[in-house]
Amino acid sequence: MQQMTIFVISDSSGETALTVAQTAVSQYPTIQVSYQRFPFIQTDSILDGILNLAKKQRAMIFHTLVSPKLSQHVREFAAMNHLQQFDCIQPAMDVMHQATGLEPEGVPGLVHNLNDTYFDRIAAMEFAVTYDDGKDPTGLLKADIVILGVSRTSKTPLSLFLANRNLRVANLPLSPKTQLPDELWQVDPKRIFGLTNRPEILRKIRQERMLSYGLPADSAYSDTAKITEELAYAQKLYKKIGCLVIDVSNKSIEETATLIMESVDYDLIPHSLQD
């Protein structure tokens, strides 16, 4: 069965774009689709982080962004990176403009009330983008949750998904040859989650990754022995830290996120609000 990933990006709840995507997909029953939803996106930095993730996953994009600037950015990014995208709102607004001669308000979320939860979510999304992939280890000390894992264990999409649940997440890639930041040892183990996978599944994921770059599938990156070594190193580290370990093999992002949200001690992160 053919598989596809669809990103739903919106400056509001994303219900409209999700409904359009699901309606279109329903006409193709032989395709297995994974949806990743990113609501309340209103800044360039967050949008860029999501678009780069879409590029990595070769995802199709359905979006409702009332800002012409952000909407155009999605279209241009998709064209430049050979991604399929569908704008679910700008064409409709253009028709309204032509029919009435009036300019749109250009204000996102007019049909939704903004509250503290909304602003917490925006802050969490900004945090996830800033402290993705170990870019700044100081984020480990500021995060509600720290996610560890070797390459291609879904750290970034998981971080963004949890950010949509108002959790501030930093993630750190693991490799036997990479020195761990000192900040990691200052984080409460109850806030750390280690991801693992089966070598054969991870090998396939990495091979597909190489092919998406137009490179040979078989390389040191997708070598089974190297992957096994990386996973063993990660497992040893998790045991030393004393953190919860989650096997993400054959789990969706949503399933892994649910396990984390059910396991996290919210008394340690009082500023994070849950829906």
UniProtKB/Swiss-Prot annotation:
It catalyses: N(tele)-phospho-L-histidyl/L-threonyl-[pyruvate, phosphate dikinase] + ADP = N(tele)-phospho-L-histidyl/O-phospho-L-threonyl-[pyruvate, phosphate dikinase] + AMP + H(+); N(tele)-phospho-L-histidyl/O-phospho-L-threonyl-[pyruvate, phosphate dikinase] + phosphate + H(+) = N(tele)-phospho-L-histidyl/L-threonyl-[pyruvate, phosphate dikinase] + diphosphate. GO terms for molecular function: ADP binding; ATP binding; phosphotransferase activity, phosphate group as acceptor; protein serine/threonine kinase activity. It comes from Levilactobacillus brevis (strain ATCC 367 / BCRC 12310 / CIP 105137 / JCM 1170 / LMG 11437 / NCIMB 947 / NCTC 947). This is Putative pyruvate, phosphate dikinase regulatory protein. It holds the Pfam family Kinase-PPPase. Belongs to the pyruvate, phosphate/water dikinase regulatory protein family. PDRP subfamily. Bifunctional serine/threonine kinase and phosphorylase involved in the regulation of the pyruvate, phosphate dikinase (PPDK) by catalyzing its phosphorylation/dephosphorylation. It is an enzyme of class 2 (transferase). The keyword Nucleotide-binding applies. HAMAP family: PDRP. It comes from the Bacteria. Its EC number is 2.7.11.32, 2.7.4.27. ADP binds at residues 149-156. Keywords: Kinase, Nucleotide-binding, Serine/threonine-protein kinase, Transferase.
